[in-house]
Each structure stands twice: as structure tokens, then as C-alpha cells.
């Protein structure tokens, strides 16, 4: 199955998906030193996003969230890619400055934690491969 959205980035990426059904604030919601979700209200609290394809509806919170995404990247704890239903500037800028491929405008209800996907930010495609 292929899903279509709009992409930012160049590299085709494959990986395991981790899905949150709640909006995510990177500032105070993700530990930039460990890549662990620390937001007490998150449905994926305690999970690591390191090396996974992070899926969530949209970002929320402070503009500092872009720099938290960048810190995750610098610390080697960033997601491999990000898929969101609704693109907003905080997450988009964070992905761009960190070199993390991003696909927006995708119906995330089709994705489940543990699935394997391939994303192509140039075409905006998300392909479920396992």
C-alpha cells in the first residue's frame, strides 16, 4: 500500500514506524540526550524514537522544538524520518535544519507501530513494506 503526501528532503529511507496518535511537543516532550519520549501525556511515553520513523498528527508547542529536533540529530538520537498529517513550521524547520526526511499530509491512521515503511520525500510517497 502506498500513501501520498508532500515531502521535504532528498534521501529515500526505510525503517520501523513508531506511531503516536497525539500531537507532539519536542520541547519538554522528548529528551534530546536520549531520544526517549518524556511527555507524561504521550501515548508513546518511555519509547525511543532513535533510528525509527516517527509518525504523529502534528507538532505542538514552543518554537524551540525545532532546536530540540536539531539537538536529537547532533546527539545521534534523532528519528530516521518523520511522517505527519499536518505540517507546521516547528517540525518542518526542525527536520530541514537536521537533515531528517519529512512527509506531511498523510493519513496516519493507516500506519501502526512496528510496521516497516519506505519513504521517498522527493515524491511524497510512503510505502508500507512490512
Swiss-Prot record:
Catalytic activity: (R)-5-phosphomevalonate = (2E)-3-methyl-5-phosphooxypent-2-enoate + H2O
Catalytic residues identified in the record: 62
GO MF annotation terms: hydro-lyase activity
InterPro entries named among the record's database cross-references: PMDh-S-like, PMDh-S-like_dom, PMDh_S
Superkingdom: Archaea
GO biological process: isopentenyl diphosphate biosynthetic process, mevalonate pathway
One Pfam family hit: AcnX_swivel_put
UniProt-listed SUPFAM superfamilies: LeuD/IlvD-like
Keywords assigned: Isoprene biosynthesis, Lyase
CDD domains, A to Z: AcnX_swivel (cd01356)
Pathways per UniProt: Isoprenoid biosynthesis; isopentenyl diphosphate biosynthesis via mevalonate pathway
EC number(s) recorded for this UniProt protein: 4.2.1.182
Subunit structure: Heterodimer composed of a large subunit (PMDh-L) and a small subunit (PMDh-S).
Function summary: Component of a hydro-lyase that catalyzes the dehydration of mevalonate 5-phosphate (MVA5P) to form trans-anhydromevalonate 5-phosphate (tAHMP). Involved in the archaeal mevalonate (MVA) pathway, which provides fundamental precursors for isoprenoid biosynthesis, such as isopentenyl diphosphate (IPP) and dimethylallyl diphosphate (DMAPP).
Family (UniProt): Belongs to the AcnX type II small subunit family.
PANTHER family: DUF521 DOMAIN PROTEIN (AFU_ORTHOLOGUE AFUA_6G00490) (PTHR36577:SF3)
UniProt protein name: Phosphomevalonate dehydratase small subunit
Species this chain originates from: Pyrococcus abyssi (strain GE5 / Orsay)
Origin organism lineage: Archaea, Methanobacteriati, Methanobacteriota, Thermococci, Thermococcales
Amino acid at each position: 500500500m502506498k500513501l501520498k503526501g508532500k515531502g521535504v528532503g532528498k534521501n529515500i529511507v526505510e525503517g520501523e514506524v513508531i506511531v503516536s496518535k497525539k500531537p507532539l511537543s519536542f520541547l519538554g516532550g522528548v529528551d534530546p540526550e536520549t531520544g526517549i519520549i518524556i511527555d507524561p501525556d504521550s501515548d508513546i511515553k518511555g519509547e525511543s524514537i532513535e533510528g525509527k520513523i516517527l509518525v504523529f498528527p502534528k507538532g505542538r508547542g514552543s518554537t524551540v522544538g525545532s532546536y530540540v529536533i536539531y539537538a536529537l540529530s547532533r546527539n545521534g538520537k534523532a528519528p530516521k524520518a518523520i511522517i505527519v498529517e499536518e505540517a507546521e513550521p516547528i517540525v518542518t524547520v526542525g527536520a530541514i535544519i537536521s537533515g531528517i526526511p519529512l512527509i506531511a499530509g498523510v493519513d496516519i491512521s493507516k500506519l501502526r507501530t512496528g510496521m516497516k515503511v519506505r519513504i521517498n520525500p522527493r515524491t511524497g510517497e510512503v510505502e508500507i513494506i512490512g
